[in-house]
Design a protein with these regions (language model features):
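Extracytoplasmic/secreted proteins, especially bacterial periplasmic and envelope-associated proteins
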Residues: 19-20, 79, 134
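Short, well-ordered alpha-helices that flank and scaffold nucleotide-derived cofactor binding pockets
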Residues: 26
């Protein structure tokens, strides 16, 4: 069969790929959606997140996760937070949970942030820091 059973698929992406994964999670009901250093679909021209971010999607919000770095040098952390608020992953008053010195289950939050030293903060969410495997396991398996 050529049919993809999307509800069995975990979709993830980094940077621009985080936006692609997010968009796919809007259009398909996936098992889980993980965004690393994104989504980055913020318009500085209109000073707002892209319209599609607030559209209804098929993947439950409880199955959507994000991992950001607070000192991202490529994409503004503040813009990424506004995007997560438009998605509904964060409430208007929430911030991603800083997890540098925490252990799983990270207060069962769906939006996490790092402030670990890295050569590239933007890439730190998918880099080689020893703290990341536990965070990734949480993103892939938390209920």
């Amino acid at each position: 069969s050529n049919n993809i059973d999307w509800k069995k698929i975990v979709v993830a992406g980094h940077s621009q790929g985080a936006g692609h994964a997010c968009y796919l999670g809007k259009k398909k009901l996936v098992e889980r959606l993980i965004m690393f250093s994104g989504p980055n679909d913020y318009s500085t021209h209109f000073n707002s997140p892209a319209n599609w971010l607030s559209d209804d999607g098929l993947t439950e919000l409880s199955k959507q996760y994000a991992l950001l770095h607070i000192n991202d040098e490529i994409i503004s952390y503040d813009f990424q937070i506004l995007n997560l608020k438009d998605l509904g992953i964060l409430t208007l008053s929430e911030e991603p949970l800083l997890v540098d010195n925490l252990s799983s289950p990270y207060n069962n939050k769906n939006a996490l942030s790092l402030n670990i030293p890295a050569f590239s903060n933007h890439n730190a969410t998918v880099g080689g820091n020893a703290k990341l495997p536990n965070i990734w396991t949480y993103l892939l398996t938390s209920e």
